Amino acid sequence: MNRLTIIIAAICCTMLAYAQPPQGFGGPRVEPQYKNVNYAGDELEAHQMDIYLPQGNQERYKVVVAIYGSAWFANNMKGMAYMSIGKPLTDAGFAVVCINHRSSGDARFPAQIHDVKAAIRYLRANADRYRLDTSFIGITGFSSGGHLSALAGVTNGMKSRTVGATTVDLEGAVSGHPDESSRVDAVVDWFGPVDMARMENCETVKDGNSPEAALMGGAPADMPEMVSLISPITYVTKDCPRFLVIHGDADNVVPHCQSAYFAEELEKAGCLEEFITVPGGQHGPVTFNEGTFKRMVDFFLKESAEKAQSPNKKLTLKQADGKYVVEYQGKTVLRIEADGYGLGKTFAQRQELTFVRHLHEDYTMLSGKRLHASNEANEYAVAVDDRTRLVWRLYNDGVAFRYELTGMNGETLPEERTAYLIPEGKNRWVQRWTEPYEAFFPHATTGESRDHRWGYPALIEAQEGVFALLSEADINRRQSASCLRNDGDVERYRVCPDKNDLKMTDNWHSPWRMAIVGTLANVVESTLVTDLSEPCRLTDTSWIEPGVVSWIYWAHNHGSNDYNIIRQYVDMAVEMKLPYVLIDAEWDGMKDGKTIEDAISYAKSRGVKPMIWYNSSVGWINGAPGPKFRLNKPEDREREFAWCEKLGVAGVKIDFFSGDNQMNMDYYIDLMESTARHHLLVNFHGATIPRGWQRTYPHMLTMEAVYGAEWYNNVPTFTNRAASHNTTLPFTRNVIGPMDYTPCAFSDSQHPHITTHAHELALTVLFESGLQHLADRPESFLAQPQEVKDFLGQLPTVWDETRYVSGYPGRSAVIARRSGNTWYVAGINGMDEEQVLDADLRAIIPTFRTARLFLDGKKWEIRTATKLPTTVKCRPRGGFVYVVER
């Protein structure tokens, strides 16, 4: 305990002796306007704060929270935070909020970060009372206060974190404001301990007599998982706010290397403003000086400056030359024309963007790339004319905008005046428009084409390593979906909604036009499409069960009218433990005296849930397979789906739609609402792309809208282009929603495949779909090694999280998805020559118990591993899968 006493004495004496800013730096000392405010609604001194306002009569002040250092041993030193680092900030015009928090003697970690986040939530909830502008909340602290400030920043939006068998609740339940956000917008870390695993001589944990041991409640060497969870460096991601890190190189309490390690990780994530090393700076003395205080103030002034920006401030929006310019970390990504519909009177001068609100909404999906998602954005608005309001949302991973019209009086919408300006020479992967969205995403550097019509999504590499994925979201009734056209000007991609002759009355808004912006990791991991879409409209979702499907059509185009073939696929589902079988087209003409009722009865008797196919009867009708004309009229649709429900049908596949006009969008919604009433899962085939319905109607588990494995039945070109095409889909089509590619072809259809077995297996993980239809025939699947059959029988189609590992469109793709405590990692080579793929998972899976590797061999190489290789040598058009148990 002597060592702890020495540390505390050193910190306190140092702060008191040297913390007061130099005379003349600012004006006279400011007393707190609000003293001993309790932010938790209890009587604890540890839950008090002082609020200092600048001198003056400004209506509101932007906020900086300041936290004292005490090796986490003190619960009542909020005044020291102001004495040390607060005054320069009030002099600069900030409201400074100095908070107490529970000490390590009061409670173990994570109680201290719970207190910090509770204080921030309290400030947002009571901003009016204290004249605070909480559109900006910065945070700063020194020593242990630097640790808590850094931790508050790097855990923005995180509810909890698990390392190994240990889970930490990061938000806590202190205070009565659970609906408020605890995010911070910028961080200044003064010599805080940030990597508890390297506190002793920059290499190892300190002994059990250290302050961090008291904070954790045990010797760090005995608690490696908690050491990781208590360390801010563990949480650094691309979504962190901007950081300024300051540390003296003569600090004998917290080693300078702590901040060096931290700054390195922040730099990699693109979150570091600057790392300042103060020559001769100690744990306070010399490090605190007029120059470093000014750097802190300038940083907070810069970060709080009025501008349209994302919550993490990496993405900004400004107006220039009549366009809206989207920038990512200072680099121009998109220039957008957004001029409405020309319905109202325009203004003499272009109107300015104004801040509307900060939006923060957590929600849960039933399928998709991430179960728990957060819809967090800053919303701005601008008047286009006297009847049209343009609403912008700036997210950490993208932008979205829509038009809101008022006073519609029986008018039809004129042409929309929206365009994306994409210079020639930029890398792009865009499919030519087709009605069912079934085309390749070829690499190009030009917008030239035969008909200059393009389908969503469209991926653009705007700057080296910085991408924009264009699409749209939240299609509702009275709306059409759109495509892109660049006829007339090859660099100007106009947004062109499909035909909409509906006469509008009252108020109306467009769908969200959206762009995911950032690195390829931002693109792959984004949930922007569902963030923008309406919440789930179903009151009961307990019947919705995603899963893997035994599918007849790929090997037997007319097999669903053959009862014996259906039995084979049901039996395969039983053998491989697949929950579903899909009986495809032509079941209404069953041969051999059997009926669809017989097939459904057989599937149910074997414990397999049947799904059946329908023709939508709005697209291909003449000469098309049936059943047809059973869903178009409301009364027919209800009768048919009631019959399905009575028979025990689990879901329906509805095929052959026609276009994206308002009538068809309404038809999709009619189908989803009717199937929900009868507890039927939905797969839309020959259809439009996902635009967020997977959130609003979560029983809609997949959509085709992809040039998938079905095309091995149709054209020889798919054989040679499939591998490269497959590596574009994780960065384009599958980003926006579930994709019914129908993967896993080990044998051949009408045209052969030349991808390897491991490549095909990897597609089942690489491609996300709530219903994953397996393409191949029973004899092919049943001939595979038992490990492969077990893998497919246990394959999740619901993912807790998805992480980009490596890859580039057309070359390779490596993605990791987690289901519970199991990570599935899949990679494919899209090239015709051998490649070494980056599969470094150390940051994603730092520890694990067991791993099974599926690699390319003569057909297979399957083995267990105690260590995961960081690279994989992949055969031409090859692949791999890891199944890693934590």
Enumerate the predicted regions with their spans:
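Aromatic- and carboxylate-enriched substrate-binding clefts and catalytic-loop regions
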Residues: 586-756
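Short substrate-entry loop that stabilizes the transition state in hydrolases
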Residues: 57-61, 69-108, 147, 159
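Short beta-strand/loop motif that positions the catalytic acidic residue
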Residues: 239, 244-247, 251
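Primarily recognizes the serine-hydrolase "nucleophile elbow" in alpha/beta-hydrolase
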Residues: 118-202
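Mobile cap/lid helix-loop segments that gate and shape the active-site cleft of serine hydrolases
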Residues: 23-31, 42, 161-174, 198-235
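N-terminal accessory beta-strand-rich subdomains and adjacent acidic, glycine-rich linkers
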Residues: 311-529
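Carbohydrate-binding surface patches
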Residues: 808-845, 880-883
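N-terminal cap/lid segment of alpha/beta-hydrolase-fold proteins
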Residues: 20-59
